[in-house]
Structures are given as structure tokens and as C-alpha cells.
A protein has these predicted regions:
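Terminal-region recognition feature
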Residues: 1-121, 128-212
């Protein structure tokens, strides 16, 4: 075998190794999922977004909540017996507001008991999804995060803060437009949180939580 053949073999093994590792990880997750379902007599849905080296040559791939996730989770919920408890394992940095809101509303409308498990973190849209559940179970050091929306690379709350601190005459048109979008997005999220919480607490308390 020549040096060129060895280099080619090394390249091929390096390329497929992340794929093999990902398949093994998925198989392991499926075994754990099945065991939890048997022990709790429930339907378990995983919504896990963590940095995993699963593309060519093992470069990190970051995942967030997207429309594909909402389609898969909502389909799984609709295919579950309404009498069966629903357990959702949530580990995500957040993602697309529309997708997270769709999942949250589907969970909120589910007639059976829904429990969300947060082993490490559920930020932004992940927190929105968690708030839709009947019960949230977290590990001792797990965290939830604020549900403030993002406008591209900018947090909506930060855009609004800039507008509050500067005179309107000193703010360019683009920033004013962003501020208007940020205000609308923030109001939408606040109303959505109230909608998800109003059957779990009184209206005033729901408004207070939504404003956090």
C-alpha cells in the first residue's frame, strides 16, 4: 500500500468517524428512552440541541430549535394516546420563536399530564416550551433562561434599551425600525407566556412572570 493510499484511507476514516459516533449515540439514546417509557408508562420525546461533531471531518455543528423540530415534536404529540403522560427531555439553547411557540402550544393543548425534564439548560425558546408543561423537573444545577426574542444577532431587549437611553434625534432610522420590531416581538412573547400560564395561576401573577 502506497503512501497516497494510506493518506486516502486516513481521510475516509476521519470523514466517517463522526457519522459512526452519531449513530452509536442515537442508538444509546433510544435504549435509554425506551427504558424511561417502560418505567414511567409514558411517551418520551427528546428535544436535544448540543454541539456535536457529526459533519465532515468532525467540525462542530450547532443546532437550535427550528421548524423541522416543531413538525417532528407536534407529530409525535398528535400520535400519542391522549391518556398517556408525556415526558419531554429538553436540552436546548433556544432557537426560532415561531417553532418554539408552536411546540409550546401543542404541549399546552395536550390533554394528558406533561412533564418537562431539564438536565442541563433550556434557554430562550426552550424556557417557553418548559412553561407550557404541567410540571418542570430540573437537576440541581440546571438553568432556565429569559424568553426575550432575538432580532438577527441583537437581543430585542438590548435594542429597546438603546432607544430608551438616547434622544430620538440621535438614533438612525434602521435602529428605530429595529426597535419597533423588538417591541412587537417582545409583546408577542409576553402575551404567549401569559397564555401558557393563565390556567396555572391567576392573571396578575402570570403577567408578573411574563414581564421577568
Amino acid at each position: 500500500m502506497s503512501m497516497l493510499d494510506l493518506l486516502w484511507l486516513f481521510f475516509m476514516l476521519t470523514a466517517i468517524q463522526p457519522v459512526v459516533r452519531q449513530k452509536l449515540l442515537e442508538t444509546s439514546r433510544q435504549r435509554v428512552l425506551s427504558r424511561i417509557e417502560r418505567e414511567r408508562n409514558s411517551r418520551v420525546i427528546l428535544l436535544i440541541h448540543r454541539q456535536e461533531t457529526m459533519n465532515l471531518l468532525g467540525f462542530p455543528l450547532f443546532r437550535y430549535i427550528d421548524i423541522d423540530d416543531s413538525e417532528e415534536v407536534i407529530r409525535a404529540i398528535h400520535m400519542t394516546d391522549p391518556q398517556l403522560p408525556l415526558d419531554i427531555v429538553l436540552h436546548t439553547p433556544g432557537g426560532l420563536v415561531l417553532a418554539a411557540l408552536q411546540i409550546a402550544r401543542a404541549i399546552h393543548a395536550y390533554p394528558g399530564k406533561v412533564t418537562v425534564f431539564v438536565p442541563h439548560y433550556a434557554m430562550s425558546g426552550g424556557t417557553l416550551i418548559a412553561l407550557a408543561a404541567d410540571e418542570i423537573v430540573m437537576s440541581p444545577h440546571a438553568v432556565l433562561g429569559p424568553v426575550d426574542p432575538q432580532l438577527g444577532q441583537y437581543p430585542a431587549a438590548s435594542v429597546l434599551k438603546v432607544v430608551e437611553q438616547k434622544p430620538v434625534a440621535d438614533i438612525d432610522d434602521q435602529t428605530l425600525i429595529l426597535a419597533d420590531l423588538a417591541r412587537k416581538a417582545t409583546d408577542q412573547i409576553r402575551r404567549s407566556v401569559v397564555e401558557l400560564l393563565k390556567d396555572k395561576m391567576d392573571a396578575d401573577r402570570a403577567e408578573q412572570v411574563a414581564a421577568m
